């Protein structure tokens, strides 16, 4: 058993799994009498990046892995400190050529939490922010700033999504052009110019909640450029792998990616399946 444990530890460390998790995984495999099965699987993992693309659940993705459900489910549920979120350990443990590459996200070049067969993947769980790093630190309660821009007569109902209050203000106003200019001033102030969110036109504001949708989608599309993002529903273990703007827009249109809140300057999204 000692040799097996050592062999497993080395393989897990090569995947950059933090030591606390390595010890837990070895202990779990020992308790479930699966050390030799785990060692054999780690030496020859069968699940590929293509399998990740074609599946939509961590449970079905790991179904072919020849280890007990008890073991697999505990690994899928692993999350905790040290910047490791749910799903990360499972993906790097069960997939071929996979390792954790996450850590401090100090620039938009930090493209992922995990790398699988040279594909970097960012993992986003519930209440995800799809917002570029260079503006993400601007998050704060926007009420005072909005009133400074639009005036005290802008009513922001507590508990609503503030873009809907701003949109209502626009629709009720007699000088729509003036309010549209103020909306674009807000976009510029909140999102660092127009590099992430393009200026909005009156034709973009015709549907209900169109400002909310516009801001959310523009921020997400800017963030997703050149990235692969896996959105995970931590309650169901279902996920969507977003590899393009089209993947994102299709899932937003179908309601699979849902806006949870917009309490500061940024939307929080969830994968709703």
Task: Annotate each predicted stretch with a short phrase.
Residues 1-111, 119, 124-273:
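Nucleic-acid endonuclease domains
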């Amino acid at each position: 058993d000692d040799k097996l444990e050592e062999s497993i530890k080395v393989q897990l460390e090569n995947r950059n799994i933090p030591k606390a998790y390595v010890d837990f995984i070895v202990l779990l495999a020992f308790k479930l009498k699966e050390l030799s099965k785990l060692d054999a699987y780690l030496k020859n993992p069968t699940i590929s990046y293509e399998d990740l693309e074609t599946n939509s659940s961590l449970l079905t993705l790991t179904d072919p892995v020849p280890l007990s459900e008890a073991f697999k489910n505990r690994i899928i549920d692993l999350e905790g400190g040290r910047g490791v979120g749910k799903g990360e350990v499972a993906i790097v443990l069960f997939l071929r050529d996979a390792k954790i590459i996450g850590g401090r996200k100090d620039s938009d070049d930090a493209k992922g939490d995990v790398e699988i067969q040279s594909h970097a993947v960012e993992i986003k769980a519930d209440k995800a922010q799809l917002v570029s790093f260079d503006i993400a630190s601007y998050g704060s309660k926007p009420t005072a700033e909005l009133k400074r821009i639009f005036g005290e007569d802008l009513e922001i109902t507590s508990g609503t999504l503030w873009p809907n209050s701003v949109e209502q203000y626009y629709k009720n106003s007699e000088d729509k052009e003036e309010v549209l200019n103020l909306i674009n001033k807000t976009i510029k102030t909140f999102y660092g110019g127009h590099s992430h969110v393009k200026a909005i036109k009156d034709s973009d504001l015709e549907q209900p909640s169109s400002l909310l949708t516009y801001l959310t989608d523009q921020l997400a599309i800017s963030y997703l450029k050149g990235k692969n993002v896996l959105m995970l529903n931590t309650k169901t273990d279902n996920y969507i792998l977003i590899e393009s703007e089209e993947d994102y827009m299709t899932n937003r249109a179908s309601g699979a990616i849902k806006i949870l809140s917009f309490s500061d300057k940024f939307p929080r999204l969830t994968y709703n399946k």
